[in-house]
Amino acid sequence: MTIHRADLLLPGAGRAPVPGGAVLVDGRSIEAVGPYEELAAARPAARVRRWPGVLTPGLCNPYGPELLEQAYHPDPREADELGTEPLTGAALAALEMTESRWGASARRGVRRMLAHGTVAVAGRLRRETVADAVARSGLGFDERFEDPQGPPALDPLAGGRPVEDAFVLPPLDFEGRQADFAVFDVPGLSADGDPYAALARAGAASCVATVLDGRLVHRRA
């Protein structure tokens, strides 16, 4: 068992913030949510991970197809030639793309998503190698009934999207919930301030840790 504690916990679904909150993870599930002191007293033998900032449900990126099937994420070895940012449009059309290359690009794209607190993507993936890369990563799939507004972004909070709209449901305190959550090092967090506004300003690039299915899949160096 592991207790993940943070300065503030946002359970999601309109639940009240928990200062000094924590989640108790047992395998792939969240066993308990609440103030750290209560969880530590109930499970004194549990391992403890201390994170700065805000612990929230993991995020859903609404641009699954756009970021993984309509963009190429360069290999670091290609940085001198192609740069480091995703390539789209004419730059993508100029590349010789094979199924193997699409799969490798998707794996790199998934890693970048995990580094933004993403635990699920929305939108149907039609390319088999891309869908396989996402499935193997453990990312969840959400249905999408209309195209999202604004340009595709690795940050699910970009473009003024309400923070709670980006949270994957159910809330963290839902009984038996899968252990998918993220932690964001939000500057300027205060006891009397609005944590949602602070997180929106910081953006998902402030992610310091992402836990997917109980596994720590991203940790900022």
Q: Could you tell me what each predicted segment is?
A:
Residues 116-155:
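Active-site loop-helix segments enriched in His/Asp/Glu that coordinate
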Residues 66-128, 157-159, 166-172, 185, ...:
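Divalent metal-binding segments
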Residues 1-42, 165-203, 211-221:
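N-terminal metal-binding scaffold of metallo-dependent hydrolase/deaminase domains
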Residues 112, 133, 175:
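Hydrophobic/aromatic ligand-binding patch that stacks against planar heteroaromatic rings
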